[in-house]
Design a protein with these regions (language model features):
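Nucleic-acid nuclease catalytic cores
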Residues: 69-114
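Beta-rich catalytic cores
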Residues: 31
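Conserved catalytic cores of phosphodiester-cleaving nucleases, focusing on short active-site segments
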Residues: 35-37, 43-53
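Charged phosphate-binding loop/patch that engages nucleotide di/tri-phosphates or the phosphate backbone
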Residues: 121-151
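Short, conserved beta-strand edge motifs with alternating hydrophobic and charged residues
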Residues: 24, 46-49, 77
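Structured catalytic cores of enzymes that bind and process phosphorylated ligands/cofactors
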Residues: 14, 103, 112-123
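Acidic-basic catalytic patches of nuclease active cores, encompassing PD-(D/E)XK
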Residues: 1-26, 40, 147-149
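Mg2+/Mn2+-dependent nuclease catalytic core
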Residues: 52-71
């Protein structure tokens, strides 16, 4: 069960065969994403971790600015917690994801370029990958740079 971003980090670390993750100390440079990843294709990427109980995702102004300035290779992983109570309001969505209170955790991966939509519309924005399991997100991140020429 995921209760906070630390639990999301632990799940990601445990599930991410083939990807090396380094956790970044964010107090040094505000807005820098939580993780630096390096996959089996020798591709670096960043990952901002977010946990929410409803559709709204909270970002600091520094995080928004960072994602606006960085393009490909910067991602946001949002998890909607199963710890929603009966009073939590969630909007109906067309993409992958359960919406009932008390339902399972769902994972959503977004590109950096989607940051302004995420601030405005939260999880109503279609993810590039999403679902009940984190495996598909790991598969996507592991595939980054697969078509790039190797040295």
């Amino acid at each position: 069960m995921i209760k906070n971003e630390r639990d999301l980090w632990k799940l990601l670390k445990k599930s991410s065969a083939g990807i090396l993750f380094d956790r970044i100390e964010n107090w040094a440079v505000p807005g820098v994403p939580d993780l630096l990843g390096y996959n089996q294709n020798k591709t670096f990427f960043t990952l901002e971790l977010k946990l929410t109980k409803a559709n709204k995702i909270k970002f600091s102004p520094h995080q928004v600015s960072w994602h606006l300035r960085h393009g490909p290779g910067a991602f946001i992983l949002a998890a909607r917690s199963m710890n929603r109570d009966k009073n939590t309001t969630v909007a109906k969505m067309q993409h992958v994801g359960g919406l009932r209170a008390g339902g399972p955790t769902h994972f959503f991966l977004y590109e950096s370029r989607q940051i302004l939509d995420l601030v405005a519309r939260g999880l109503k924005v279609d993810p590039i990958v999403g679902g009940l399991r984190i495996d598909e997100i790991i598969k996507f991140l592991n595939g980054l740079g697969a078509n790039a020429p190797r040295p």
